[in-house]
């Protein structure tokens, strides 16, 4: 005969794991479900070793902080971009970003670097200041007469100077002409001396005595 329950689930359900291993005894009610999130950091079972204190550790820490600050000030340090606004403005195009400003502040020894890498900074042109000069009063008739007299005196002085220069030039030209004439006369005398021949070949010597000679001379 089959059992009354027939093995079809009419009996009490059994747990698949041992409840006593979790810390719950027989007959104890299960704890209610927790509706709060779990803690972010569970309690530490093992605490870290305390940091070594002393002059050497403080010196190394100061060097590390100094190196970190120097690296952030270099031009190739990438900084986070500034978040853009929802509404773009016209002036935002002409505002320079942070890394470019930092690169301009960097002043290395350019004698060791090629000229092509040197950064050219545009200098702002200074606004021209217009200076208003006081207006000159209009010239009167007396001032005009004085200026005319000054001009006349200057013209007379110029004429005197030009006349003296002309006289000096004429004297120099006369001297040059006289020197040229003397030189031409000397050349003419030398030429006539060369033209006149003073050479005697002796053909006319003894012309009268040839008639009285009986024998021929070879």
Curated annotation (Swiss-Prot):
GO terms for cellular component: cytosol; nucleoplasm; nucleus; RNA polymerase III complex. Widely expressed. Expressed in CD4-positive T cells. Residues 133-218 are annotated as: Disordered. It is found in: Nucleus. PANTHER family: DNA-DIRECTED RNA POLYMERASE III, DNA-DIRECTED RNA POLYMERASE III SUBUNIT RPC7-LIKE. Keywords: Disease variant, Dwarfism, Nucleus. It is linked to Short stature, oligodontia, dysmorphic facies, and motor delay: An autosomal recessive disorder with phenotypic variability. The main clinical features include endosteal hyperostosis, short stature, oligodontia, mild facial dysmorphisms, and delayed motor development. Some patients show progeroid features. Its main location: nucleus. It comes from the Eukaryota. Component of the RNA polymerase III (Pol III) complex consisting of 17 subunits. Pol III exists as two alternative complexes defined by the mutually exclusive incorporation of subunit POLR3G/RPC7alpha or POLR3GL/RPC7beta. Found in a trimeric complex with POLR3C/RPC3 and POLR3F/RPC6. Directly interacts with POLR3C. The keyword DNA repair does not apply. Residues 139-160 have a biased composition (Basic and acidic residues). One of its GO terms (biological process) is transcription by RNA polymerase III. DNA-dependent RNA polymerase catalyzes the transcription of DNA into RNA using the four ribonucleoside triphosphates as substrates. Specific peripheric component of RNA polymerase III which synthesizes small RNAs, such as 5S rRNA and tRNAs. Belongs to the eukaryotic RPC7 RNA polymerase subunit family. Residues 161-193, 201-218 have a biased composition (Acidic residues). It comes from Homo sapiens. This is DNA-directed RNA polymerase III subunit RPC7-like. The keyword Transmembrane helix does not apply.
